[in-house]
């Protein structure tokens, strides 16, 4: 399931990047503005996130499709070491398969220089700034997921919030770091485009940012972990992860434990 979700995510990234940036794309003459293309890319990938979360696979597996997310839930006690390892391996292999399928379906178009397999690469400010940016946006994304998914009211909107952040990040942050927040998202294109020089950024910064978010989450909640490891609890699929306490009606109540 996680392999399929990561594959869909990377297939969508390659297909949208080809549509928006390939010189032979029929929409190229109508989209000369780079900022507009990034906004459309963000909207497309945000909708992709929503679609993945709401599939039967996403409802069952939790819709991580990101080794950094899986590592964070392992840290929070929701997953066993073996489950986390298999999840991560599936996500990485799925990302590779997604890029391969996009290349096959689109007859090699994602390899074009302007598209470069929808790779996530450091922007104009260099590797150091890209690392910091990836850590920050990953911290914000995981903080939003953890706090909303464990709130009785807001948990219904966690997947919408996560998708919205992805869309905003791609539209406005991608010139800085390429916008990954996901080692698998970067790994798939890197395999085919041989983009190795900055791979370490995307394998280190997102996990560090998300793990930092988990520490803040635990601190605010007085050490109480999350209910489940899903982005969408309100469905007919049982939680396959280690259960936590019931959803909090108010985050403020749990924060009283550290007062």
Question: Where is each model-derived feature located?
Answer:
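Membrane-interface helix-loop junctions and terminal tails of multi-pass membrane proteins
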Residues: 1-259
């Amino acid at each position: 399931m996680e392999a399929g979700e990561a594959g869909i995510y990377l297939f969508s990234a390659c297909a949208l990047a080809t549509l928006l940036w390939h010189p032979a794309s029929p929409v190229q003459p109508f989209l000369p503005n780079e900022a507009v293309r990034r906004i459309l890319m963000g909207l497309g990938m945000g909708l992709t996130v929503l679609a993945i979360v709401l599939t039967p696979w996403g409802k069952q597996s939790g819709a991580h499709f990101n080794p950094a997310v899986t590592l964070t839930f392992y840290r929070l006690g929701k997953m066993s070491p073996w489950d986390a390892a298999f999840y991560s391996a599936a996500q990485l292999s799925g990302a590779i398969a997604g890029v391969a399928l996009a290349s096959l379906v689109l007859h090699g178009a994602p390899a074009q220089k302007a598209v470069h397999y929808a790779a996530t690469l450091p922007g104009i400010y260099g590797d150091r700034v890209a690392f910091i940016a990836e850590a920050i946006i990953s911290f914000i994304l995981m903080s939003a997921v953890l706090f909303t998914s464990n709130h009785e009211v807001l948990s219904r909107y966690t997947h919408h919030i996560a998708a919205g952040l992805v869309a905003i990040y791609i539209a406005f942050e991608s010139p800085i770091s390429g916008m990954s927040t996901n080692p698998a998202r970067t790994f798939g294109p890197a395999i085919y485009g041989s983009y190795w020089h900055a791979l370490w950024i995307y394998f280190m910064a997102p996990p560090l940012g998300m793990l930092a978010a988990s520490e803040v989450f635990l601190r605010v909640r007085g050490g109480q972990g999350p209910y489940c490891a899903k982005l969408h609890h309100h469905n007919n699929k049982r939680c396959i992860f280690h259960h936590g306490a019931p959803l909090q009606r108010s985050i403020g109540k749990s924060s009283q434990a550290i007062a």
